């Protein structure tokens, strides 16, 4: 076996039920923060090099040994002209060798360097850390879809506008009108909650679902391992879409989101509308019969 090689495979939880089950063990942290499981296979001496990530990560040693050197340093300058973001001045403060079953947690921007000691495999459980700019852009795009209806159809009026000597100057009244239009578009607090939930449950670009088999009657159901389901006080979110929910059906759907399955006893409490929606999700491949 050649030395100093590393193979990284991202999003393995989307393709393997066993890895998806491993990721479920980390749901003591909200699903809104869960991202994916990456598997790193390396031969003797293999590693990415000293670097840092912009997100929290748990490093679980699955096979063999890997030596980790880590440090919380302020100097995050990078080696120039490198395809990978490698730290130019890495200064480790701690040094550990992880054996199978050992795990290391690293917060964002914590410098680290992992080197295989013999053939090894490491599972990296990563967590998403939304950035304000990205989050604002995504939410504004989603909010814009209902902005026209929310803001209404009032027309700008300037009947008292006097003649001007500087025609290129922006009228203050028009600026205030624009500000008022934006405030009206955002006046519904549930609109922001809906946009956030849809964004957080949007499947990744490399995820697609195949149409499922439609059972004659649902006895029990489970979420597809690739499905993202969350909820707030007023909505249910699944794979980038949202539904208003209340009462017994809301409790049932929240349990599906938390437990990722519903038993036959629980399904007997569902209304005809909820059962119809579950059948629709089965057809989409988002949910599957569990029996």
What does each of the following model-derived ranges do?
Residues 105-107, 290:
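Residue-level recognition of conserved beta-strand edge/terminus positions
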Residues 1-102, 110, 115-155:
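Active-site region of the double-stranded beta-helix
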Residues 252-270:
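Short acidic, hydrophobic short linear motifs in intrinsically disordered regions
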Residues 140-216:
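C-terminal amphipathic alpha-helical segment
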Residues 268-283:
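Short amphipathic alpha-helical interaction segments
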Residues 183-257, 279, 290-291:
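Acidic, low-complexity/disordered tracts enriched in E/D and polar residues
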């Amino acid at each position: 076996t050649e030395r100093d090689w590393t193979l990284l495979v991202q999003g393995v939880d989307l393709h393997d039920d066993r890895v998806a089950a491993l990721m479920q063990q980390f749901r003591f942290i909200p699903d809104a923060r869960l991202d994916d499981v990456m598997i790193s296979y390396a031969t003797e001496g293999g590693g990415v090099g000293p670097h840092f990530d912009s997100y929290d990560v748990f490093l679980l040693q699955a096979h063999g040994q890997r030596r980790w050197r880590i440090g919380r340093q302020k100097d995050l300058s990078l080696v120039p002209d490198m395809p990978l973001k490698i730290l130019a001045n890495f200064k480790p403060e701690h040094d550990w060798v992880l054996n199978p079953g050992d795990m290391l947690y690293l917060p964002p921007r914590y410098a680290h360097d992992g080197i295989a000691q013999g053939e090894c495999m490491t599972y990296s459980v990563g967590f998403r850390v939304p950035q304000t700019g990205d989050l604002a852009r995504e939410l504004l795009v989603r909010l814009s879809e209902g902005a026209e209806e929310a803001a209404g159809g009032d027309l700008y009026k300037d009947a008292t506008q006097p003649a001007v000597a500087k025609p290129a100057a922006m009228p203050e009244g028009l600026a205030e009108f624009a500000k008022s239009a934006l405030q009206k578009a955002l006046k519904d607090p549930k609109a922001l909650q809906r946009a956030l939930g849809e964004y957080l449950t949007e499947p990744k670009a490399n995820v697609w679902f195949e149409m499922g088999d439609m059972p004659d009657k649902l006895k029990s159901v489970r979420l597809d391992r690739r499905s993202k389901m969350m909820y707030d006080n007023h909505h249910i979110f699944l794979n980038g879409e949202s539904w208003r929910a209340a009462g017994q059906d809301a409790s049932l759907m929240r349990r599906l989101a938390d437990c990722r399955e519903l038993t036959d006893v629980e399904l007997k409490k569902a209304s005809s509308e909820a059962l119809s929606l579950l059948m629709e999700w089965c057809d989409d491949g988002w949910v599957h019969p569990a029996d």
